[in-house]
From Swiss-Prot:
Residues 70-434, 466-493, 545-759 are cytoplasmic. Its EC number is 2.3.1.15, 2.3.1.42. It is an enzyme of class 2 (transferase). CDD domains: LPLAT_AAK14816-like. GO terms for biological process: CDP-diacylglycerol biosynthetic process; phospholipid biosynthetic process. Residues 736-759 have a biased composition (Acidic residues). The HXXXXD motif is essential for acyltransferase activity and may constitute the binding site for the phosphate moiety of the glycerol-3-phosphate. This is Glycerol-3-phosphate O-acyltransferase 1. The keyword Nucleotide-binding does not apply. The gene is SCT1. Residues 1-48, 450, 515-523 are lumenal. Belongs to the GPAT/DAPAT family. Residues 613-667, 684-705, 729-759 are annotated as: Disordered. Residues 647-659 have a biased composition (Basic and acidic residues).
């Protein structure tokens, strides 16, 4: 959805003729007639409900097209007050605003009204859907271009100067109007008109395509459109924001499929400053939004919407905008701030080759992590690596690394193998042959399950592909900034699916109802049940198809390991070497460019794979297993002895270790204060009968009498010794319990690691 091209309006005719880089800036004061023509009205409850229903419905439909839609930084979105959502890059024509509206609605429950071109509103499906979202229509001058009399060409020495033949520039054209070329090859804004056959443009035509340059140098027909007064649009936006509502805008002006951002239009800055200038008590905040896609035009791809930090507009900047002499500087300053905010939430590259190299660097850098990184973190990693690559690309290490990465990518294309499947293929002929066989059987089963849904929905697939490709060719012929016009493909695929899927379900339901016409069933129930069944079958085919495609992609490296094992081994070796070099380079240069980059913390958080660390863990686990086995044997040995009570254990312990008690106490406490002077050498009389059957048969009456006498004399010492012994046994028991708990935890970790390895 494009942003309006805004024109500046000054009070005097003299100021109207000034030339500036921001000729699209409108004056801070809006026409009084426009103010009176539009009066803001709060949307009715019905409109709000329809907005919520339409957003929820389309957002879930888009979830069928995209495999995953994620939001990041939604907590930064203000929950109150006027907000302008500035989104870029505009890579999906009518998909972008719906995804953004859905994320905002889901996170902070706020409604966003997008600015949309009036020409788009005239398209039946787009205009119908836009009516539910309270969109604001904008008339663009280029949409009003009409053929004019005569032909034009540019001066070879000055491309801004246009020379006319049989033209009437003085009567047919006006300053700040548009001169357009045929076949949508571009347009330019008139700066001044010297005569009927000569005028000067503010900026020269874009001559990126050879046919455009040839036409302008040899002569061509042209179109003209008068300047459009956008004061009504301004006033409507100002009032919308003044009532604490949200506006959405794509400041690039139109959708495109380039890898970098287009120059931002000044309209978004004027909207924010103009609203705060007209309503001093209003505080407008601007939230940059990054629309990040992985293959935006492909079915079942992924999308990430990232919200940046809100941009606060200082009162000093509003005062600067209020002054006619400095208002352009204020707009430029705010526009630069918005541009920096967008760059912080988007991934942009200078060319496609750079993007491919950076994505390979990111993928190979991630090989050190044993856990899967979240999608928003991958986007942030892409963004930082793009910035780092652009900054250090002339470094000899980076240049050599780039050369090797491009060679590796060429090898991947040669084998038609994606990078993430290279390491999965192991050169084991018998095992891989079995895997290919069993996975092929599984794929056949999945294919048979998905086949009914595929057959039922195939007309929509075919129609959507053909129409979207035709729309892409049309859009490419009318644009000077698109590369392949992939930005319109997803939009038309979704629109065709939304329009024809219900019709197709009705068609199949009618056939089923007709087939079952002889059954004594209610026809309405049969039709309704058939319709619901068609929806369930096709959606199930979608889910099963995802699983099947993942399995089908995994067959390629297995087949390659059977047919070209040496080539696969070399590819795996090159990948490992590249990964080691990339990890070293990123860790070295990353901390220099980004102070908050901490590779150690990243490694710790995502459980980095380290061979030395794994060996250490394995050794520790083996040691604990050995201790556990020894403990089990000791327990079995103890259980076979005739000791049947804890007290007997204590007595046996005293009987066998009485000589070492004192030494152990000295060694442990390094003190003599708690060592008993008299140890309990013999058993108590009350225990003698039990001890005689469990420890030793020799216990004469003399010894028993002597034991009683000693116990009477040395009862205190005996109690102290017994207390110390109990304490030691308790400590040993607690220590053993702790070791058992640690061993159990280690066993659980081993089981989890084994399951992850199997997965």
């Amino acid at each position: 959805m494009p942003a309006p091209k805004l024109t500046e309006k000054f009070a005097s005719s003299k100021s109207t003729q000034k030339t500036t880089n921001y000729s699209s800036i409108e004056a801070k004061s809006v026409k009084t007639s426009a103010d009176q023509a539009y009066i803001y009205q709060e949307p009715s409850a019905t409109k709000k409900i329809l907005y919520s229903i339409a957003t929820w419905l389309l957002y879930n439909i888009f979830h069928c097209f995209f495999r995953e839609i994620r939001g990041r930084g939604s907590f930064k979105v203000p929950q109150q007050g006027p907000v302008i959502f500035v989104a870029a890059p505009h890579a999906n024509q009518f998909v972008d605003p719906v995804i953004l509206m859905g994320e905002v609605k889901k996170s902070v429950n706020r409604r966003v009204s997008f600015l949309i071109a009036e020409s788009s509103l005239k398209q039946p499906p787009i205009g119908f859907l836009a009516s539910f979202f309270m969109a604001i229509g904008v008339v663009r001058p280029q949409d009003n271009l009409k053929p004019a009399e005569g032909t034009i060409r540019v001066d070879p020495t000055d491309y801004k100067r246009v020379i006319g033949h049989d033209t009437h520039f003085l009567t047919d054209c006006m300053p700040k109007g548009l001169i357009g070329l045929p076949k949508s090859m571009g347009f330019g804004e008139i700066q001044s008109i010297e005569s009927d056959t000569s005028l000067t443009l503010r900026k020269e035509f874009k001559m990126a395509k050879p046919e455009i340059k040839t036409a302008l140098l040899t002569g061509t027909t042209y179109k003209y459109a008068a300047k459009v007064d956008q004061s009504c649009v301004y006033h409507r936006v100002f009032e919308h924001l003044a009532h604490n509502n949200c506006i959405g805008i794509f400041p690039e002006g139109g959708s495109h499929d380039r890898t970098n951002l287009l120059p931002l239009k000044a309209g978004v800055a004027i909207m924010a400053l103009g609203c705060m200038d007209k309503h001093p008590d209003v505080n407008v905040k601007i939230v940059p939004c990054g629309m990040n896609y992985f293959h935006p035009h492909k079915f079942r791809s992924r999308a990430v919407v990232e919200f940046g930090d809100p941009i606060e507009i200082p009162k000093e900047l509003v005062a600067k905008y209020h002054n006619p002499e400095t208002n352009r500087d204020a707009v430029k300053e705010l526009l630069d701030t918005i541009s920096k905010g967008l760059q912080s939430v988007t991934v942009t590259c200078s060319d496609y080759e750079t993007l491919m190299v950076v994505q390979t660097i990111r993928r190979l850098y991630m090989t050190q992590f044993s856990t899967k990184l979240p999608l928003p973190l991958i986007v942030e990693m892409n963004r930082r690596m793009v910035k780092g690559y652009e900054f250090y690309r002339n470094d000899p290490k980076i240049a050599d690394l780039t050369k090797d990465i491009m060679a590796y990518n060429a090898a991947l294309r040669h084998y038609n193998l994606p990078d993430h499947l290279v390491e999965e293929a192991k050169v084991n002929f018998a095992k891989n042959l079995g895997l290919v066989f069993f996975r092929s059987i599984g794929l056949c089963i999945l294919f048979s399950l998905a086949m009914p849904g595929i057959i039922m929905f195939s007309p929509v697939f075919i129609l959507a592909k053909r129409i979207s490709q035709e729309k892409a060719r049309t859009a490419l012929s009318k644009s000077t900034v698109k590369i392949k016009a992939n930005d319109v493909i997803a939009t038309w695929k979704i629109l065709i699916g939304m329009g024809f899927a219900p019709l197709l379900y009705i068609f199949w339901s009618v056939l089923i109802t007709y087939y079952l016409r002889h059954k004594p069933w209610n026809k309405i129930y049969v039709f309704s049940g058939s319709y619901i069944s068609c929806v369930i079958v096709t959606y199930s085919a979608l889910i099963v198809g995802d699983i099947g495609m993942d399995g089908f992609k995994s067959l390629r490296p297995l087949v390659l390991s059977l047919t070209s094992p040496k080539g696969l081994q070399k590819l795996q070796k090159d990948r490992r070497n590249l990964a080691e070099r990339i990890i070293e380079v990123v860790n070295n240069f990353g901390s220099e460019l980004f102070p908050d980059f901490d590779s150690a913390a990243l490694r710790e958080e995502f459980d980095v794979i380290d061979e030395e660390e794994e060996d250490r863990k394995t050794s520790e686990l083996n040691r604990r297993k050995m201790l556990r086995k020894q403990k089990i044997k000791r327990q079995e040995k103890d259980s076979s002895s005739p000791i049947i009570s804890q007290r007997d254990n204590h007595d046996a312990y005293e009987h066998h270790n009485q000589d070492s008690d004192g030494v152990s106490l000295v060694n442990s406490d390094n003190s003599l204060s708690n060592i008993p002077l008299f140890s309990s050498t013999f058993h108590r009389k009350s225990e003698s009968s039990l001890a005689s059957t469990s420890v030793a048969p020799s216990s004469s009456s003399e010894f028993e009498v002597e034991n009683e006498i000693l116990e009477e004399k040395n009862g205190l010492a005996s109690k102290i010794a017994q207390a110390v012994l109990n304490k030691r046994i308790g400590e040993n028991t607690a220590r053993e319990e702790e070791e058992e708990e640690e061993e159990e935890e280690e066993e659980e970790e081993e089981e989890e690691e084994g399951k992850e390895g199997d997965a």
